[in-house]
UniProtKB/Swiss-Prot annotation:
Subunit record text: F-type ATPases have 2 components, F(1) - the catalytic core - and F(0) - the membrane proton channel. F(1) has five subunits: alpha(3), beta(3), gamma(1), delta(1), epsilon(1). F(0) has three main subunits: a(1), b(2) and c(10-14). The alpha and beta chains form an alternating ring which encloses part of the gamma chain. F(1) is attached to F(0) by a central stalk formed by the gamma and epsilon chains, while a peripheral stalk is formed by the delta and b chains.
Stated name of the protein: ATP synthase subunit b
Gene: atpF
Keyword annotations: ATP synthesis, Cell membrane, CF(0), Hydrogen ion transport, Ion transport, Membrane, Transmembrane, Transmembrane helix, Transport
Disulfide bonds: none
GO CC terms of this entry: plasma membrane; proton-transporting ATP synthase complex
Protein topology in the membrane: Single-pass membrane protein
Top-rank taxon, per record: Bacteria
Alphabetical list of NCBIfam families matching this protein: ATP_synt_b, PRK05759.1-2
Residue intervals passing through the bilayer: 3-23
Organism: Stenotrophomonas maltophilia (strain K279a)
Function as written in the Swiss-Prot or TrEMBL entry: F(1)F(0) ATP synthase produces ATP from ADP in the presence of a proton or sodium gradient. F-type ATPases consist of two structural domains, F(1) containing the extramembraneous catalytic core and F(0) containing the membrane proton channel, linked together by a central stalk and a peripheral stalk. During catalysis, ATP synthesis in the catalytic domain of F(1) is coupled via a rotary mechanism of the central stalk subunits to proton translocation. Component of the F(0) channel, it forms part of the peripheral stalk, linking F(1) to F(0).
One of the Pfam families matching this protein, by short name: ATP-synt_B
InterPro entries reported for this sequence: ATP_synth_B-like_membr_sf, ATP_synth_b/b'su_bac/chlpt, ATP_synth_F0_bsu_bac, ATP_synthase_B_chain
Molecular function terms from GO: proton-transporting ATP synthase activity, rotational mechanism; proton-transporting ATPase activity, rotational mechanism
């Protein structure tokens, strides 16, 4: 065999191989690479969108937590205010009740003192009448001298 013929046959075989690769294998391979690049780009874009969505969701969660804390603090403040109102109302009611009880006790004391004074006046009147009877050695008519005895009792 001739070296030129071998070289020419190899060159033709190589050219045929290049032509087959360029027409049959290269386009599908490039399409597959482009599709893969496109999928990777879409995946990266989806990851970016997901990251943005996550950041937005995190902001919403933080805002909701802030609102919940604010509402909880408001509820706690309202509960404290209500508790203070209840305590103040109970204190005022206790003061009112104590004042009422004190007034009732004072009224009872005054009534008892008045009864004691009245009893004492009656006893003094009776003693005065008895003493006068003994001094005069005669009985004084209580009905006849009642006005005089009442005046004497009121002075005592």
């Amino acid at each position: 065999m001739n070296i030129n013929f071998t070289l020419l046959a190899q060159a033709l075989a190589f050219a045929g191989l290049i032509w087959i690769i360029a027409t049959k294998i290269w386009p599908p391979l490039m399409n597959a690479i482009e599709e893969r690049q496109q999928k990777i780009a879409e995946g990266l874009a989806a990851a970016d969108r997901s990251q943005k969505d996550l950041a937005q969701a995190q902001e919403k969660v933080n805002e909701a937590l802030k609102e919940a804390r604010t509402k909880a603090n408001e509820i706690i403040d309202q509960a404290h205010a209500r508790a203070n109102q209840i305590v103040d109302a109970a204190r005022n009611e206790a003061i009112t009740e104590a004042t009422r009880q004190k007034e009732l006790a004072q009224a009872e004391i005054d009534a008892a003192a008045n009864r004691a004074r009245e009893d004492l006046r009656k006893q003094v009147s009776a003693l005065a009448v008895t003493g006068a009877e003994k001094l005069l050695k005669r009985e004084i008519d209580a009905n006849a001298h009642k006005a005089l005895l009442d005046e004497l009792a009121s002075e005592i």
